């Protein structure tokens, strides 16, 4: 019998969509060349919309929501990643058109992954999460335009 793992799955219904807690197996994972054992994910505004169906965030059904995650590579056909590597993902349509971080595992394209920065745990990376990453990009853009805190 195939090993299973827990997941939240958004499924299409006559009335819109439903969120269910299910057990999946590797054969249920979407296409990709890296399989990651998900350790942490976050709950972002977009995730809330996807979970409730309040906005059409999910574009493919059934789908595991979760626009980001951090975890450990389980298997890889991408030469940049090996089993045991710690990685982070955010963006790339994950949680919208490709299954995301609200499952025990995710299979994604290696181009979408970033090695976990040294000195950070997967938990710490997701404590910052997509919202923190977005905020930092905004700060960097301000700095690139010469704006300083004292301005």
Cite the ranges covered by each PLM segment.
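Short glycine/threonine/proline-enriched tight-turn/helix- or strand-capping micro-motif at secondary-structure
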Residues: 15-25, 54
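NAD(P)H dinucleotide-binding glycine-rich loop of Rossmann-like/cofactor-binding domains
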Residues: 90-151
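Short polar catalytic/cofactor-binding loops
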Residues: 11-15, 41-43
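Glycine-rich beta-strand-centered segment in the early N-terminal region that forms part
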Residues: 27-43, 54-94, 100, 112
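Cytochrome P450 core scaffold surrounding the K-helix E-X-X-R motif
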Residues: 46-52
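Eukaryotic N-terminal low-complexity, Ser/Thr- and Lys/Arg-rich leader segments
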Residues: 1-6
């Amino acid at each position: 019998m195939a090993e299973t793992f827990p997941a939240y799955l958004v499924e299409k219904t006559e009335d819109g969509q439903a969120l269910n807690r299910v057990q999946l197996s590797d054969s249920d994972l979407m296409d990709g060349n890296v399989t990651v054992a998900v350790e942490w994910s976050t709950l972002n505004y977009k995730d809330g919309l996807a979970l409730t169906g309040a906005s059409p965030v999910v574009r493919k059904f059934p789908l595991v929501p979760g626009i980001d995650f951090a975890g450990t590579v389980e298997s890889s056909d991408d030469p940049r990643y090996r089993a045991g590597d710690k990685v982070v993902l955010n963006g790339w349509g994950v949680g919208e058109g490709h299954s995301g971080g609200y499952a025990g595992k995710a299979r994604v394209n290696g181009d979408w992954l970033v090695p976990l920065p040294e000195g950070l745990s997967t938990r710490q990376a997701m404590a910052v999460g997509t919202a923190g990453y977005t905020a930092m990009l905004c700060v960097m853009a301000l700095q690139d335009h010469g704006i300083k805190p004292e301005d």
